[in-house]
Structures are given as structure tokens and as C-alpha cells.
Amino acid sequence: MEKFTAKLRDIQETKFPIVKAAFKGKDEQIYIGVMMIDTGSVNCILNKSVLPNLNDDAAIEGKTMKIHSVQGRGVECQGYSLSFRIGNGVFSDTFYVNKEMDFDQMFDGPFIGIIGHEFLRRNNMVLDYETETLHASEGSIKGNPEDYAFFFTMSYGLKQYNIPVVGLVYGDKEYLMVADSGANDTVITKHLMDDAGICVRHLDNEGTVTCFTTDTLETALYDVTLSIISVGGTPECPKLYTQNDKVQVISNCQYIMDGLKDAEGNDLMPISGMLSSNFMHKNKWVLDFGTGVMFQRKDE
């Protein structure tokens, strides 16, 4: 059986991991467009402009969900059943619709929707910035963590936050960021930048971040140093993967997400930022949802 694979469109041009997609709608007509792979989204999201093309029975009765965005803001979304093709595979899943937001203005060409990480996990897929493909996982990782420039497991983030996260370490201070392919620019809070002392230089004062709830947050642009923890060190001497990045800095909140608790009701560390698709593409990261590992290979 042929293994699943789908080519990503030119990420330098699109800014996001985008795949060509198609679905059969009313009157047996085939509709062609694109979908975005969003590792910062749990669920699949359908663009509201697609709704008139769906079968009348596509809405799932009683299937609604409040989907949250930055700072805990949420919006109630209706679930729809969608069968679709990407690459050489055909899939079916529940997609949720935010009827207050139209994604067409954000993307070039007919935009069908967003593929969340639960879909990637169920179907054992890999978002591969090195080969610029979405493909089936091999089910195992070659070599040891020390053989990679960066290596980190998704298990903690997925278990506690239901999103893949990475840890930042600066001396005795630790922070968390979402590995978010749905963010074209890395976003952090000013609290993180100032508290960790990671500013290299200020670049610009005028920027914005648009959230899933349609809220727009004003930002400033900075060059910062990100020291991301990687498997292979010790508690006393962690292995750090250090890269500079141009980031959007939010000043009106201390954290991106806070007030979170685990299954036992214990407080969880707040989330201080979102690591972008641009960063992961630039550094050729591989996010393997079949094995639950994120990594970057060492240069040959």
C-alpha cells in the first residue's frame, strides 16, 4: 500500500504549511482549494465560506465546541462532517466553524480549512519542514537524541496542555511556548522578553496579531535569543538549542495562556509564546506526530 504523502506549497511564499485539498459537495461537484496544517490547533476548522457547498446534512446535530485562542478567549463553533482528499489520501473528520471569521482574506486562493494536531496524531502524520511535505510516520526515530541538533518529545505538552510545547531556559528561569505552525511569526509576551533578558534589539513598533476569536492584538517587533531545551543534557546542565528570531511582542498581557490546571487540579506553568512556522521552516524542524517527537537533524 502506498504511504501517504502531500507536498507543501512554497512556505517562504505562503508563510504557513499549506496543502492542496479537495472535497465532494452538493450535486456531486468537486471543490478544490487549500488547507493549512496548524499544530497549535487541537481541532480541524472549516472556513465559513465553504458551508454553502456542503451537503445539507453535513452539520452534526448537538456537536458544538468552544474553541479558545490567546488569553483564554473563546468562540462557540458548530461541528460539520467533511470527507476530503489531500495528497494521495482520503480522510473524514469533524470540522468546526467560526461563523464570525472568514479565512479567505488571509490566504491566496479558495481556503477550505485548518487541519489540527488531533487529526495528525490519529493518522500518524509528520509535518516535515526539511522535505516540505506532510507524510506518514515511519513509527520510529533513528539514532539517539544526542545525534540531533534539537530533539524534544511532545508527550508533556500533549498530556498537560493538549498542544505540543517547547521549554525555554535562561539560568534558573523556565518558560513554555507552543510549537505553532499556524503562527507565521513567533509571538512572545513582553514579560518573557524582559524577565529573561533576551532582547537583542528593537526593530519596529507597528505590528498586529489576529486571533481565532477575530481579536487583533498590537505588537512590537524585536530580535531575541531563544534558548530552547533539548533532550540530552542533565538537570544541572541542560542541553540548549539556541537560535535568534524576529518576534512579535505582546505587551498587554503577562502570558499567552494562564490559569491552567492538570487533571488533578494542580496549577500548570503558563504559556508565554508561540514558536512560528517561519522559525521551524528556517531551521528544518520535523514534527512527527506518529512517534510524538520534534527534532532537527544535524548538518552533514
Name each region found by the language model.
Residues 1-300:
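Pepsin/retropepsin-fold aspartyl endopeptidases
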